[in-house]
Amino acid sequence: MKKITLIGSELAKTGNEFIYLGPLEECEPCRFKRICHNNLEVGTRYKIVSVRSANHPCTVHENGVKVVEVMPAEFTIIIESKKALEGVTLTHSDIHCDRVCCENYLACHPEGISGKYRVSSILPEKVECKKGNSLKKISIVPVQQ
């Protein structure tokens, strides 16, 4: 489902993704606060699907903000093989691992996942785990609640 929000003009490009972190103190007195923040969920990754041309003033973004349509982004993560079933709905939990230099670490500990998500596809790529875990790379989409 598409949502309307505002984002810094420099960042407002179709296809860009961002993780919504919540309002800043500077946002409190702004007349656009509701449009910027009420439609988004903290910790969720969004993809910009369209950008409108009008520019609006903003105390946070130097070059103002633009109205954009966003939707929760589909993205790739790594999970335990036993949980990797196409179409299933899961709540994400990071894989227990302290090897931050591992090439898979960021995919095993992704940012921007909050709440439940649906496994949209299981990718054929082989995932090598130095700790011996059986892992799969999957594409996910957030489940709207």
UniProtKB/Swiss-Prot annotation:
Pfam family, one: UPF0179
InterPro entries: UPF0179
Domain of life: Archaea
HAMAP family named in the record: UPF0179
Family from the record: Belongs to the UPF0179 family.
UniProt name for this protein: UPF0179 protein MmarC5_1728
Organism in which the protein naturally occurs: Methanococcus maripaludis (strain C5 / ATCC BAA-1333)
Taxonomic lineage: Archaea, Methanobacteriati, Methanobacteriota, Methanomada group, Methanococci
